[in-house]
Amino acid sequence: MLENSTLFADIILPLALPRLFTYRVPRHLENQIVELQRVIVPFGKSKRYSGIVHKLHHQAPGDREARYIEDVLDEEPTINAEQLQFWEWLATYYMCSLGEVMNATLPSGMKLSSETVIRALEIGEQDNEPELTDREQLILDALKVAGELSLKDVSDIAGIKTVFPILRGMMEKRLVVSDEEIKDVFKRKTEVYIHLSEEFKEEGALNVLLNQLSKAPKQEELLLAFMSSTNGFNEKMESVSRKELLKRSGAKSTVLLQMLKKGIFIAESRAISRLGGNAATSESVSLSEAQTRALEDIRLGFSQNKVVLLHGLTGSGKTEIYMQLIRDALDRGEQVLYMLPEIALTSQIINRLRVQFGRKVQVYHSRFSENERMEVWQAVAKQSSEGSLIVGARSSLFLPFRNLGLIMVDEEHDPSYKQNDPAPRYQGRDAAIYMSGLYNTHILLGTATPSVESYFHAMSGKYHYVRLAERFGGAMLPEILIADLKEDTKKQKMKGIFSPMLLKTLSETTAKEKQSILFRNRRGFAPMLECNKCHWVPHCVQCDISLTYHKSVHQLKCHYCGYSMNVPSKCGECESTDMRMKGFGTEKIEEELSSLIPELRIARMDLDTTRSKYGHHKLIEDFQEQRIDVLIGTQMISKGLDFDHVQLVAVLSADSMLNYPDFRAYERSFQLLSQVSGRAGRRKEPGLAIIQTWKPEHPVLEWVKNHDYDGFYENEIGEREKFGYPPFTRLINLSLRHESNLELDDAADKLGNYLRRTFGSRILGPEYPPVSRVRNLFQKNILVKIEAKASLKKVKDELNKQISRFFSEFPLKGYRLVIDVDPYN
């Protein structure tokens, strides 16, 4: 670097901005700053943010005077080069900014801004009593009075412009936390250890002490237990954890406290890892002939550097194959990412993996605290053995892998892999495929019901295809019966929402001490409350959707924005008190079934009952141990769960999913119904699945009944080709949003017509979606269809250009445009 040349840095800020911003590096930071590091920069009139150094260079910005970087937050790069490439691909492919990707990717503890609020830690939350500088004491005194302060307030109080270095030091001393941390304070987990005071470590002094304690037998016993725990008298007399010492001695904590006060023992707090798990307790699993053939075929696909699609029946033993592939990668010293679509799946699979791989297995998903996620992040970045096998939802893609050898995407067909809000609106499976190329690693997609796109790529030779066509251990596929609700209703045989076939089979299943699963893709008690006189229905005040009744809290709730209200005693239109519940959800199923068969032990598994960190784990454990006879659930019970004693699975209403206005409706219905049915009879006894419907002749139900994926696919791919839908086209959805539907109509029509000048018949709409207003914003969609052979990059570049021109020519106020590439909804 030339001595007189000025160093500049392009910074990624965690904001939805279309470009990077260039800052000047002050001389005193030139030897500290490196690319991909976090820095503090000013932005706007008074705000400050932590950003990532994208690039260092000597080119001054031509449009403005560059402002100075204020501080460097890390000694080393925060992210690695592969992560940056991955960020850039996400931003380009999904048409969003690098700042939006950064905001979604980094744990909240790594993001600071001038809007961050600081508060003091309570006494007892602090690890010790550190020495304070005058400024630190000044800030703490102010916090004790105010409770919390913005960074601007702290700056004014301390009398300095840049407060980040001081606050960083105070955070390290455990004096203060930021608002991101208040939700889940990021601090090392600690455990108290006890060691003997130095003055008693000589044998003579220790004997004198033992004689003195003969008059205090409980303290004497505790000292002897300590010596036993540290292998008797020796020069080191190493420490023992407080928890273990009290357990071994049987002493009460008050006895230990007395000895601490006397100075016999000294207590110290030590940081320990949150990354749990025991050592591995089992060797590798043995595979059947069919599994062994599939494993060898997968390895063949890996040797050809292809994406591998494993198409295995429900209950065919895909997980055992996954575990062998994991073992191969770990034996090579590589990191492994095992992706699952649903948090509910993790507890069961984690238990199986930890038996095989012990502490190497770690979990990364949103239900875990910021503390735990940060420790997993750090373990992955350091290539620690604790964290060499990561099990997680789609966000686990963003971890700082350095030696990634294998990615497995289980249930690859699942729509939960798609991020809807906020940006980047990425598809986890597709992002994983790109990432496998970036890291030059193997990738396996596994499912019993492949997505139409993945199967198409497998049949065309783009992916390597492996079929596992028999269930593990000789288990038979479940028999699937269709219950005709129209006929049963006509003959007045229905008992509420239950067909006679289902009730009879439920009773028989329980009598045999077997278990049942009931599926309904709607939580809550009833879909809606309706006036029996004028048919008025309470709607959300912010969304164009009826409110769902939740009996447990006796409230009506919106599942889009969270709005809730008390149940009205009379109609909001005609004031009639004749209000009726229409439809049914998981709560109502539970209540009705309890009244029909009171002896059943019933539990629900939906978002309402699994909100806590371990809510789903407790339910799965209780069901596994047969403390529950019937498990009622939403779609989370359809995905990969494996129970020994489930003989009956029932779908209470198949019609709502079959009738959904979306080109993927048949695909989703076939996948969901097949997956739910596959939970039954996964051991030697055959299972039974019952699907209740008003349309028993529906072709999707026939394919499901006959376990006929090929028949479903041939029909579906023909329809997609005929009407121009993926995989024969690519889709981009433009959602224009505004508070006024009248203004939105006008603006959306203008935008649609403007884009047709360039894209012609490839532009469809604008149209209102089924739910046309969410969170007080009306929305209209414009769909862009792109031929599969066309350059998607060129189309997106041109689309961005035309959208920018449109908003330049028509400067609309109060509008929001959301772009969704490869939309699922």
Predicted regions and their residues:
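Accessory, non-ATPase domains that flank or precede helicase/AAA+ motor cores in DNA-metabolism machines
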Residues: 1-447, 461-475, 758, 792-825
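A short, contiguous, amphipathic alpha-helix enriched in charged residues
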Residues: 8, 33, 743-756
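Solvent-exposed residues in well-ordered beta-strands and their adjoining turns
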Residues: 14, 26, 737-739, 785-787
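Short amphipathic alpha-helical segments
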Residues: 19, 241, 730-732, 778-780
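Solvent-exposed, membrane-proximal periplasmic/extracellular interface segments of envelope transport
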Residues: 57-66, 70-76, 672, 769, ...
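Inter-lobe coupling/hinge segments of SF2-like helicase ATPases
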Residues: 282-288, 292-296, 304-745, 753, ...
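Short secondary-structure junctions
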Residues: 597-600, 755-763, 808-813
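A carboxyl-terminal module marker
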Residues: 753-778, 817, 821
